[in-house]
Amino acid sequence: MLPMITGFMNYGQQTLRAARYIGQGFMITLSHTNRLPVTIQYPYEKLITSERFRGRIHFEFDKCIACEVCVRVCPIDLPVVDWKLETNIRKKRLLNYSIDFGICIFCGNCVEYCPTNCLSMTEEYEFSTYDRHELNYNQIALGRLPMSVIDDYTIRTILNSPQTKNGENPLI
């Protein structure tokens, strides 16, 4: 009789422990109902990038003095700068400037150390292509400014900060 009573007590304790674990999981599930969804519908919705986002590089041909500082500070010697020395004025004349974004690691050193600020980072991050040679941008392609995500009326923009439905930020 005694082993039967202890067996029922053990069964009751295990049942209570299982119910407590199920209750804990249910409480976690309920706490997540107050949060905004994490996923977005990508082609139709895009996240607004921060100001310091390092996207595609924008190049201004007229400002460049062909000093090649960008090549020297690049960890992979990526920018290709072709120039010609003008002997009559003793200055370099820029002929061609290109960057292969298939190799670029987007470190931002070229933008940071450029003495004339002819390089800047944009918010463009979509580089999908079927041919890797299309990722090699010359000065004409680098000079085009991409359309801002905020200005594109076909895309719904979403702030890139975790918030709850009540509007409070849980990280603060």
UniProtKB/Swiss-Prot annotation:
InterPro entries: 4Fe4S_Fe-S-bd, 4Fe4S_Fe_S_CS, NADH_quinone_OxRdtase_chainI, NDHI. It is an enzyme of class 7 (translocase). Its cofactor is [4Fe-4S] cluster. Coiled coil: none annotated. One of its GO terms (cellular component) is chloroplast thylakoid membrane. It holds the Pfam family Fer4_9. Its EC number is 7.1.1.-. Binds 2 [4Fe-4S] clusters per subunit. The keyword Endoplasmic reticulum does not apply. It catalyses: a plastoquinone + NADH + (n+1) H(+)(in) = a plastoquinol + NAD(+) + n H(+)(out); a plastoquinone + NADPH + (n+1) H(+)(in) = a plastoquinol + NADP(+) + n H(+)(out). It is a peripheral membrane protein. GO terms for molecular function: 4 iron, 4 sulfur cluster binding; iron ion binding; NADH dehydrogenase (ubiquinone) activity; quinone binding. Gene3D superfamilies: 3.30.70.3270. Keywords: 4Fe-4S, Chloroplast, Iron, Iron-sulfur, Membrane, Metal-binding, NAD, NADP, Plastid, Plastoquinone, Quinone, Repeat, Thylakoid, Translocase. Its main location: plastid. [4Fe-4S] cluster 2 binds at C74, C104, C107, C110. It is found in: Plastid, Chloroplast thylakoid membrane. [4Fe-4S] cluster 1 binds at C64, C67, C70, C114. GO terms for biological process: photosynthesis, light reaction. Belongs to the complex I 23 kDa subunit family. NDH is composed of at least 16 different subunits, 5 of which are encoded in the nucleus. This is NAD(P)H-quinone oxidoreductase subunit I, chloroplastic. It comes from Crucihimalaya wallichii (Rock-cress).
